[in-house]
Each structure stands twice: as structure tokens, then as C-alpha cells.
Amino acid sequence: MDSFNPTTKTQAALTAALQAASTAGNPEIRPAHLLMALLTQNDGIAAPLLEAVGVEPATVRAETQRLLDRLPQATGASTQPQLSRESLAAITTAQQLATELDDEYVSTEHVMVGLATGDSDVAKLLTGHGASPQALREAFVKVRGSARVTSPEPEATYQALQKYSTDLTARAREGKLDPVIGRDNEIRRVVQVLSRRTKNNPVLIGEPGVGKTAIVEGLAQRIVAGDVPESLRDKTIVALDLGSMVAGSKYRGEFEERLKAVLDDIKNSAGQIITFIDELHTIVGAGATGEGAMDAGNMIKPMLARGELRLVGATTLDEYRKHIEKDAALERRFQQVYVGEPSVEDTIGILRGLKDRYEVHHGVRITDSALVAAATLSDRYITARFLPDKAIDLVDEAASRLRMEIDSRPVEIDEVERLVRRLEIEEMALSKEEDEASAERLAKLRSELADQKEKLAELTTRWQNEKNAIEIVRDLKEQLEALRGESERAERDGDLAKAAELRYGRIPEVEKKLDAALPQAQAREQVMLKEEVGPDDIADVVSAWTGIPAGRLLEGETAKLLRMEDELGKRVIGQKAAVTAVSDAVRRSRAGVSDPNRPTGAFMFLGPTGVGKTELAKALADFLFDDERAMVRIDMSEYGEKHTVARLIGAPPGYVGYEAGGQLTEAVRRRPYTVVLFDEIEKAHPDVFDVLLQVLDEGRLTDGHGRTVDFRNTILILTSNLGSGGSAEQVLAAVRATFKPEFINRLDDVLIFEGLNPEELVRIVDIQLAQLGKRLAQRRLQLQVSLPAKRWLAQRGFDPVYGARPLRRLVQQAIGDQLAKMLLAGQVHDGDTVPVNVSPDADSLILG
């Protein structure tokens, strides 16, 4: 035992056996302790060894536990348990076997053979089950191959391919992969490259979410179905998991050892295995720990060039350019296969193919119109992602939302339940009272409580029945899918009798049950549970993701849009033309008749200061989002310098602020349905207008990161004071002199705001007083302003040059200042009503 040199796993097993014996109070470490320690090891080789000789590890483990339970126990022993004679003999045999096989370390498989040798209880147990020393020796040669044990962690390289990869063809055989619809050209191209003699390594390149991984899964399904050329028939596709290969590799060289073992397994398969690496760019730099260490990319290069490793990769365009193209030697070993984004029509076909899987998973029905809506709405509104991924996600989330509603208690039941609880509490309180009125109320209350309890029971029963009907349909669909998968497997394996029994016996039987259950699930008088995903559900998910109201107009919203001018006119006085133009643009958008490739509306508001240009933008944001601050406001006076254009769209690469993004593009990217106000547009540098040309015409803008930001659901408002005070012709002449024709030509409308007259100012007085009243309401104070006082404010606050802004200052000075002094002096208290009148000399206002 002097030269005993255990591997890490062997040492861990001995330590675990010692602890188990010590905890149980056993005086000796018996072979049963060692076997149990080996069987319970994570990623241990004992269980695979037993499986290789046809023994069930769970059975051996249970019988080993029974042996441990019968071992003698010593109480009060202070010494550590020692190895028993049989355990020592097993380890000696393991040491001899390691020497015989020219291994440098005693590994766990050597110990397993040692435990099966001799006449101990464990040896009899293993031999009795067929795990004789000879059988175990033959099995571990199969498991570890021709590799010698030359490191303390050899187990990491055993069955390396099984450990660090997923067999896609096996998953396809089991029916666990989603069906792949279309993509025939791309799959054919991949097959062509794989059939080459050398450099037979296709790499699928495309945007995220276009279906690169699905193409490889489609190839796996075709291999299983036999729908491939002879060169690929009966091949196995394994998806390599580089993450698990790197995970836990603590020491230098450990990752390389694991990868080498995987590559050797692939090489030894004599071309039977096709390797797939998703996110191919991760091989560049994977496992490199510093100077002198090799990364995965460099390790696989020679095998790729010789054609010993058939590798299919998948990565995005950006990652390929950034990582693979940098290494020219690696890039030339791959053949690019470009995967483009499918059209909306192709996406609908893909969704129809996946529909059954999602229906079975969520237990709800998905209508065809929902699939069409998912493809069209995702294409129009979710611009930062790609089809078919974004459309599939919409369907998945809409079905998930509906399933959640089915599993949750309906609102009707919740409301009745809360009412019953409240009535029960009231009943308990009244039952303690003895007066006549309480007794009368108690009788009425008990009658009402009985009615509500009956109603609750009825609703609960109805809900449960509806839920059960939906569950029956879901279970039958699951059965049907499982039987169809079983039938396909039987057909592939040549078991035609079983395939015929399933296809003409059990499948029609389940289909018949399903046909009978479906009308029962649908024929419900008062439906509490919705079990069908429709276009409205898809539109709701789009709205939740983007904030864009993509759903059908509800009655209340329709009425609100039809009286939009009235709502905006309450805040913006005297600008009927501008209010109508903006309202029409919003209505066109919501009714779906506006140009889908342009912004909802693009207006330039012209006119003197203080007439309501900015106020209309605020009123519009308030109308659409119930918050006047819910708009993107860009003060163009801050963009007077040429270099400030970068602040709008983001600094170019290499400049300070590149990571921050643009103030305009980032705001719209986060909230694509919004009002964008460019205030005082004439103060901006002319180059800013050039940036806005694309926004006004195409409804999109490319930011500093190269991302396209969608402006098609925004309302763009540009305000300016150009030519204020002049006639309409003079104002338009000033606009033409300042802005380029191509800029003006892209606007929907140039609206000239009229100056305010004294009558309109009286209405603005009411608005200003209402705003002051809102602030005072927090102190429960009320203002009672007389009509003469309002006229006095309108008359004194009117200035044709400055518009309505002097009026706001006047309200603040004439009322706000006096009121503040009165509050501080204690002349006015919370809850008071303060009258406001004109002074006798008509020179000021009097409060109180």
C-alpha cells in the first residue's frame, strides 16, 4: 500500500466511506461502505459501469443499504474506524489492476473490480447480479476506451461525449423536438456542405431568432425519418455543451483534457457523429487561461481541416464578424450558410406547424386568426426583433396568459366570496346585540347571506365544471400527441403490427373521444372561462410589450376619440384648426387607415409666443397617456452647435458618450408609442434638420450603435416662433427662408396658431384658476372668484405680443401672493372658502 496513488474520486470515496462508518458507529470500514460511497458519487463511474453489465444501480444500492443496516455498532468508541480485512484486500486488488493496465493512478473503476473480487458480502452481491470482476473489466474498457489513467481526474474524460453533449437525433426519435416548417433550401445547403470530403463544416449565420438552431433540429428529424442522402443516413447529430465542459475545470489543462476526450470519441466514431455547436463564436477563447494555453478554436482547427470532425455551427452576423473572421485560419475551415428572416406568410406557416404543440402545452385552443395576427402585428410593431421568434413568443405568451386565467379564480367568484365574508363578520357583530332594530337587521342579513352562499356555490360548481371540461380536452390532446409519436417510432423501427394497432385502433378511439369532448367544452351557456386564443389576446400582448394600442377599439375608446377635439379644446383655447389636424391624425392611426411606413403625424406649429403650441403637445400626451409628462421633449435651443447632433442619435464609436445612446433615439426605443415635441425648432443647427428627414419620411432613424429606431407610432410636433406677429403669408415666407424645401415637404401640415383675443383670454383665466384650485385642494381651500374679477384678470393679463403667459404671472401675483400672506398670518385656515373680488378703485383684487 506504500505506492497507493488514488485519483480525486477514489480519495473522495474513501473519505465518504470513513465518514459513513463513523456516523453509523461501525468499528470498521467494510466493502459495503466503499460501494455505497461509489454509488452515491456525483458524476461517478460506478453506476454507468453497472448499467454496462446489465445491472440496475438502484437495486444494488438498496441491497448494499441492507448490508450496512446489519453491520455491528460500537458505542463510546473514541478511535476512528479502520479499513477491514476485506476492504484492504479490495484496495490491494485495485492497486494491482492499475499496475497491470499501466495506469498511474488507482481510479474508481479499479476499486469496483476490487470490491467484486474475493468472498466478501459485497463481492457475492455484485457477482450474484452479474457484475463479476471479469464482466466489470470488460465494461470499463468500453466506458473509458483505450485511455490510460494519467491524471487525478480521469473520470471527467470517461463517456465525455455523453457527458458534455445532447443527442439531437435521439431527441428527434422521441418526438421531443418541435416540427420544422419550411427552410428546405437552407437544410439542403447544409447537407451539401456536410457531404464534402474536406472542410465539410457549414456555419449557419443570421440574425437572432430567425431559426438557425431549428434548421439543425430539422436536419436531425430528417436523418431519423431517413429523408437524407446516403452519406448522412444513420448519422448522429450531437449538440456540444461548451459551458458544462468549462464548468468545474479548476486546474490548468483540465478543460483541454475534457475537450480532447470528446474530440477523440468523435474521431473514433469513424464519421458517424456530426457535431453541432450553438453560439459558435464561443469556441474562440473558450478555456484559454493565459499564456501558453490553447483555446477550443485552436484545438479543433486540425481536425476541421482534415475532415475528421464534421461540425455544424450557428452564430449571429455580428458575433461571426467579431470573433470568427478575426481568425482567418479558423474562418476558412467553415462554409457560410446565410439564414434570412422569413416573410410574414412563411411565419404564418411556421406558426401553423407549431400550433398543436402550444395547444397541448397550455391546454387552450389557438385560432388561425390569432396566428395571422401574431405574424402581422409582430412584424409591424416589434421592430427590434426578428421573425419567426417574436411571433412565436407572442402566441406563447398569449396562451400562457389565458391558461393563467383558467387556473385562477374568476372575478365573479372573488367578488361574491368577499361579500359573503363581509356579511358573516356583520352577522357575528349583530348577533351580540339585543335591541329590536338589530334583530330585524340580523334576520334580513341572514336571508341575504344564505342567497349569496347559494350563488357562490352555484358559481363555483359552474367554474369547476368548465375547468374540468377544458382539462378533459387537454388530456385527450396530450394522449393523441403521445400516441402519434409512438406510432411514428413503431413505423421507423419496422414494428408494423404495433404501428397498425395504434393508427387504426387507439388513435381513432382517442380522436372520437376528443370529437365528443370538444362540443361539450364549447357548448356553455354563460362562459366564465375563455379557452380560445384570438387576435385580441395577441394584440393585448403586443400592447403590454410596446405600449402601442394594437387591439380593436373598445366602445369607450371610440367615443373618446370621436370627441377628441372637445377634450383638447378644454385646454387649448382658440386654435381649432391645429386641434382638428392633430385629432384627425390620431383617429387615422387608431382606425388603421394611416400609412404604416410613416409617423402617425408630423406637424409644425407656428405662431407668437404664449398661444398654446407647447400646451397642445402636453394636452395630446395627457389625452393619449393620462399624463402630460408622458412625451419626449427635446428643447432645440440646446442643439445650436453642429456637434450637438450626436446628442440626438448617440455619439459615434470611439467618442465619449458612445455607450449612453442618443437622447431622442433611446427615449423612442424605450417607448415607441409617444408624442415627440421639438420645441423652438428654429434655434437648432441646420444639420439637426438633416437628421430628422428620415424620421419624417420613413419613420425610422439609425442611432450611433447602428440600431434602427422605429418612429412609425409617434406623433412628431415641431414648434417655432418664426414670423410671429406677421400675416400667414409672411409666416410661411419666413419658414421657407429658414428650412430646406425637402424638410418642409415631409411635414403633414404646417399649422399657424392665431393670436388670442380678450374673449378667449377669459376662458384661459378659468383654466389658470382651475390649476391654482388643484394646488389649493391639498389644503382643502377653495377660491370663489367673481365674474368681474375674472374679467379684470383677462383685461390686465392680455398682451398681444406675449400671449397667455403674462396672465399666468398676473394670477400668481394678484391672487397667489395675497393668499400666501393670509395663510402665513393665520387669516385663512384649512377648509375655508376664500372669495375673490375687484377692489373699489378697480386697481387690484381683494381676497376675503
UniProtKB/Swiss-Prot annotation:
Domain of life per record: Bacteria
Task: Please name one Pfam family that this protein belongs to.
Answer: AAA
Give the induction note: Expressed following heat shock under control of SigH. There is another promoter.
Q: Where is the Clp R domain positioned along the sequence?
A: 1-146
Q: Which residues bind ATP 1?
A: 206-213
Key words, A-Z: ATP-binding, Chaperone, Coiled coil, Cytoplasm, Nucleotide-binding, Repeat, Stress response
* Region annotated Linker, chain positions: 342-547
Give the start-end ranges of region C-terminal. 756-848
- The keyword Nucleus is assigned to this record: no
Sorted alphabetically, the Gene Ontology cellular component annotations on this record are: cytoplasm; peptidoglycan-based cell wall; plasma membrane
A GO BP term, please? protein refolding
- Specify the protein name: Chaperone protein ClpB
